[in-house]
């Protein structure tokens, strides 16, 4: 993409695909019921892959679409649609075929009741689908008339595939065959009758990130990118995740597509790999700078990291046209990109500078998710020359820092160019508007306040559910629900004590800590409080890796208090699950925490959190009120050892002397709907706002 866009083969296709002036949503009257078509051929094929097409028609209930009862069927008239179906194969119309690569069936978390009431964070989860949102600028008659025009556009786009390098090699067809003919999770059997949960707001969604669990992960960002797309797909959206291919991923098949991009005077060839898992397309971009970085995603010199992210974003913004998934590309109609943190904040910038400023991708929108604003892609102003952007765009990057002076800031430019932005909690949204919490970007954030929304993360209940957790199925551990909490959690606690060589005692409170060993996570606050903690009748298990001095601190604690403290330096997914299940209390003294996931995992497992009331911790852990018998844990208001000791002391007293109150804390924690389903509904609202933003 380093050259002039107007001369590239891609430009021809973009112009052909964006000639219609109306949004990619059509509606026509069929048998007295509204029948909705979205975004051209690609999204329709996605529904066929998920078993939602019968006799050539998209099955959509009237309740989901806001119309009459019943299900409408209509024959496909578009030649483009017919051609696309043919590409995908004769099995595309199968009503339902088991997905050979899907994860274990989603299991609803155990629901606990207290005083006859169920506590749930997601009060809207069972609310009826809202009425469809219609663009008032497009009359119904015009929308119907444009339907034929869109069919021509879709066909033209497919006919152009050879021109833009979207070949159909054997590898791609074999991969698409597995996707198109057999697809999706058990939940689709319900959606087949009722239509997509998103109703008329179904879109093409491309999530772009530098990491994604289980392929590559360094922290919470990887967990979010691994779970949110699946939740959006369950709502009926066609969803793709784009990440670098750091290693050899067995699931990924080579699409046979190659593109070259120039960064800092060097050409890099990017290869496209694809997998279809849990109803989501995963596209992996392979290039020399990404190879063999599986365990060192953000390693290397600052400028080398920047060049990798420039290459990644340049390639990712073109994925809708060059990555055929299930036999069809996503295209630029009815499309929203979701970029994550500074690593992909250049994507909204390239989308605007390369395409929308030139009349292309006019129906494509971008959303930027802020997971941690402390990392911003800062560098000297000279970095701008590496980004291959029009000269006037430098003003979007230039930022003055009272400490470091004038510099280039990637996150700042991304926030300005994105159509919408999301923070991972309401509390964090408030914090980043302040001088202390905004890390130099507070003025930009306040100026763009209208486009920001806070949405608390969910957790992947296929992985973090004590009822089905695979890490609790051996070595003396046990799966459990709220109904079997007394025996199951006790068994996990005893197994953890044995595994780590601690005295097996059910009466002693076991305190856990899981996290990076750095200043943000506040592990040094635990260090300051350790003399007091060691003087209590408790056991402590700490798991993490990070700063060498803090790693040494963990080893020293275990050496000095070998009868009650274990410090595991390193990281083990299995041990993290087992600590979450076996501990009675989870400590999170983070100095700042955009959302936090460990406290959510803990509550789902009946483990009571003690947290510093910042960011998402304040949003998700309501303080215990012994008089009203409400709350989920204990909070403290300053990142200081004495404040943490005070909160932890009250927690331990309740554990020992007020068993009924303790049981209530566990019940309320486990009763919450902490899944991604509610968060996905809120993200969908943001996507809709972006879609209709002009």
From Swiss-Prot:
One Pfam family recorded for the sequence: Glyco_trans_1_4
UniProt xrefs under HAMAP family: Glycogen_synth
Pathway entry: Glycan biosynthesis; starch biosynthesis
Presequence range in chain numbering: 1-15
UniProt xrefs under Gene3D superfamilies: Glycogen Phosphorylase B
Chief site of localization: plastid
Organism: Oryza sativa subsp. japonica (Rice)
Annotated signal peptide: none
Entry protein name: Soluble starch synthase 2-2, chloroplastic/amyloplastic
Recorded family membership: Belongs to the glycosyltransferase 1 family. Bacterial/plant glycogen synthase subfamily.
Purpose: May contribute to the deposition of transient starch in chloroplasts of leaves.
Annotated compartments: Plastid, Amyloplast; Plastid, Chloroplast
A single BP term in Gene Ontology: starch biosynthetic process
GO cellular-component term (any): chloroplast
Tissue distribution of the protein: Expressed in leaves and weakly in endosperm and roots.
Enzymatic reactions: [(1->4)-alpha-D-glucosyl](n) + ADP-alpha-D-glucose = [(1->4)-alpha-D-glucosyl](n+1) + ADP + H(+)
Keyword field: Amyloplast, Chloroplast, Glycosyltransferase, Plastid, Starch biosynthesis, Transferase, Transit peptide
Chain spans, region Disordered: 93-197
Bias (Basic and acidic residues) ranges: 156-176
Cystines in this chain: none
EC number assigned by the record: 2.4.1.21
Entry's Gene Ontology molecular function annotations: alpha-1,4-glucan glucosyltransferase (ADP-glucose donor) activity; alpha-1,4-glucan glucosyltransferase (UDP-glucose donor) activity
């Amino acid at each position: 993409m380093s050259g002039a866009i107007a001369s590239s083969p891609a430009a021809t296709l973009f112009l052909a695909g964006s000639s219609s002036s109306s949004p990619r949503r059509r509606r026509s009257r069929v048998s007295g019921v509204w029948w909705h078509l979205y975004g051209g051929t690609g999204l329709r094929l996605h529904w066929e892959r998920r078993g939602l097409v019968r006799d050539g028609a998209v099955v959509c209930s009237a309740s989901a679409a806001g119309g009459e009862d019943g299900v409408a069927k209509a024959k496909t008239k578009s030649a483009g649609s017919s051609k696309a179906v043919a590409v995908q194969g004769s099995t595309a119309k199968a009503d339902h075929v088991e997905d050979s690569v899907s994860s274990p069936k989603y299991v609803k978390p155990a629901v606990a009741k207290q005083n006859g009431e169920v506590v749930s964070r997601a009060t809207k989860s069972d609310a009826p689908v809202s009425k469809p949102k219609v663009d008032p600028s497009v009359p119904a008659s015009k929308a119907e008339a444009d339907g034929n025009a869109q069919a021509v556009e879709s066909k033209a786009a497919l006919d152009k595939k050879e021109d833009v390098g979207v070949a159909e090699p054997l590898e791609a067809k074999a991969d698409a065959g597995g996707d198109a003919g057999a697809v999706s999770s058990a939940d689709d059997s319900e959606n087949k009758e009722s239509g997509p949960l998103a109703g008329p707001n179904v879109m093409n969604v491309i999530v772009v990130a530098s990491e994604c669990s289980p392929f590559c992960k360094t922290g919470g960002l990887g967990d979010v990118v691994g779970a949110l797309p699946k939740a959006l797909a369950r709502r009926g959206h066609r969803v793709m995740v784009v990440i670098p291919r750091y290693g050899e991923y067995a699931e990924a098949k080579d699409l046979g597509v190659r593109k070259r991009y120039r960064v800092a005077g060097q050409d890099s060839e990017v290869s496209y790999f694809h997998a279809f898992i849990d109803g989501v397309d995963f596209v992996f971009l392979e290039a020399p700078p990404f190879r063999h970085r599986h365990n060192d995603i953000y390693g290397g010199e600052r400028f080398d990291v920047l060049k990798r992210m420039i290459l990644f974003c340049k390639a990712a913004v073109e994925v809708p046209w060059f990555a055929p998934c299930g036999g069809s590309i996503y295209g630029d109609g009815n499309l929203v990109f979701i970029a994550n943190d500074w690593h992909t904040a250049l994507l909204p910038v390239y989308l605007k500078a390369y395409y929308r400023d030139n009349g292309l991708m006019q129906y494509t929108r971008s959303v930027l998710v802020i997971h941690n604003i402390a990392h911003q892609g800062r560098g000297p102003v000279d970095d701008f020359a590496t980004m291959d952007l029009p000269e006037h765009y430098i003003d979007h990057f230039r930022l003055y820092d009272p400490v470091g002076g004038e510099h280039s800031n990637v996150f700042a430019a991304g926030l300005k160019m994105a159509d919408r932005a999301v923070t991972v909690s309401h509390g964090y949204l408030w914090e980043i508007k302040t001088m202390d919490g905004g890390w130099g970007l507070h003025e930009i954030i306040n100026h763009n306040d209208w486009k920001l929304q806070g949405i608390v993360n969910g957790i992947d209940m296929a992985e973090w559910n004590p009822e089905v957790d695979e890490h609790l199925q051996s070595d003396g551990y046990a799966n459990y629900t709220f109904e079997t909490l007394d025996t199951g959690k006790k068994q996990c606690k005893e197994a953890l004590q044995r595994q780590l060589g601690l005295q097996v005692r059910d009466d002693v409170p076991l305190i856990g800590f899981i996290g990076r060993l750095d200043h943000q996570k506040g592990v040094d606050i635990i260090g300051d409080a350790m003399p007091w903690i060691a003087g209590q009748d408790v056991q402590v298990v700490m798991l993490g890796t990070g700063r060498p001095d803090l790693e040494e601190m963990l080893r020293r604690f275990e050496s000095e208090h070998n009868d009650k403290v274990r410090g595991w330096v390193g990281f083990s997914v299995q041990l993290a699950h087992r600590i979450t299940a076996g501990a009675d209390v989870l400590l999170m003294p983070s100095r700042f925490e955009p959302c936090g996931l460990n406290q959510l995992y803990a509550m789902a497992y009946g483990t009571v959190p003690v947290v510093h009331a910042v960011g998402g911790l304040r949003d998700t852990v309501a303080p215990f009120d012994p008089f009203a018998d409400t709350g989920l844990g204990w909070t403290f208001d300053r990142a200081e050892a004495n404040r943490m000791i005070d909160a932890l002391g009250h927690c331990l007293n309740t554990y020992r002397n007020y068993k009924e109150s303790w049981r209530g804390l566990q019940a309320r924690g486990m009763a919450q709907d902490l899944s991604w389903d509610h968060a996905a509904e809120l993200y969908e609202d943001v996507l809709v706002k972006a879609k209709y933003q002009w």
